[in-house]
């Protein structure tokens, strides 16, 4: 049986090779070998995603590559998720986060990964899915009073709708009761600042650390 370092290295390779079958196999192997799932995700899967992201920024990889890598990571996380849920049930929730892909955008892979990472980190995540109407974010905020409303956009044509979340939360009189987080491929810190969002999530691991800093 491979040791921990070898398993983690294979997990990273599965992402950079866009191999969802290998990612699932490595995740199962890690569980059987007693590798900490969080360590596997952070040092294996997420490290692979960061490498793909860097190549995307350099222009050596393109959006379909990023999506394929994200699909591979999701395949691995799906295998690990039952174990993480078991652990999570034994610990106190760190807070509630409502997350969804913004109205007009049908892409959900990045959002799914962020939701999984937040779940693993100990937050209760209410996933609204993709192509979520602005009013649904606001209604859910009123209903369950989460600590954070998070929206993802993968296209410049849809990220403008993130402004509407800010505006409609204000109109509903609850903007001061909840923090907002924005993320997605075209989203930047400048954009988050411009629309008044509290948190900009650049990557899955970045999101977890920023959310903890904002709430804890």
UniProtKB/Swiss-Prot annotation:
Gene Ontology cellular-component annotations: cytosol
Keyword Metal-binding among UniProt keywords: yes
Stretches assigned to the B12-binding domain: 94-216
Record carries keyword Metal-binding: yes
Source taxon at top rank: Archaea
GO biological process, one term: homocysteine metabolic process
Keywords: Cobalt, Metal-binding, Methanogenesis, Repeat
Pathway: One-carbon metabolism; methanogenesis from trimethylamine
Protein name (record): Trimethylamine corrinoid protein 1
Lineage: Archaea, Methanobacteriati, Methanobacteriota, Stenosarchaea group, Methanomicrobia
